[in-house]
């Protein structure tokens, strides 16, 4: 079994995080939706195919949710040197949380690679607190 390694030049970043509260589409115990916009950039010298992702959501109440799966929003992006893949998705919660994420794939030689997304906070907006999150429109 070969281990995955970080590929120099392959980066992931959170471009934007916005917040939406309530509505009929959200469960009553998780009325807070965070929409995240992410870009994965391949500045390495080789082509990379992304195959899946892993998220670890650490909630302030002590619960830890691990989300793993094949594909990224239903896709397996193939990134040649200099290309980017951007997407958005969301997470619903009842409490504040910190998210750790990574994406895994293979390079053109078939080696397993991964890239880590820097951790980010899903902080529910409250009076007197100025979290680094925007309220989503509509």
Positions of PLM-derived features:
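Short, surface-exposed linear segments at secondary-structure transitions and domain or protein termini
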Residues: 59-62, 74-84, 122-132
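Short acidic, flexible loop segments centered on an aromatic residue
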Residues: 46-65
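Terminal connector regions
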Residues: 91-138
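Intrinsically disordered, low-complexity Pro/Gly/Ser/Thr-rich segments with frequent PxxP/GP/PP motifs
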Residues: 65-96
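Asparagine-centered strand-capping/turn motif at beta-strand->loop junctions
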Residues: 39-44
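Short, solvent-exposed loop/turn segments enriched in Ser/Thr/Gly
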Residues: 31-37, 98-100
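Low-complexity, acidic Ser/Thr/Pro/Gly-rich terminal tails and inter-domain linkers that flank the onset
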Residues: 1-31, 131-133
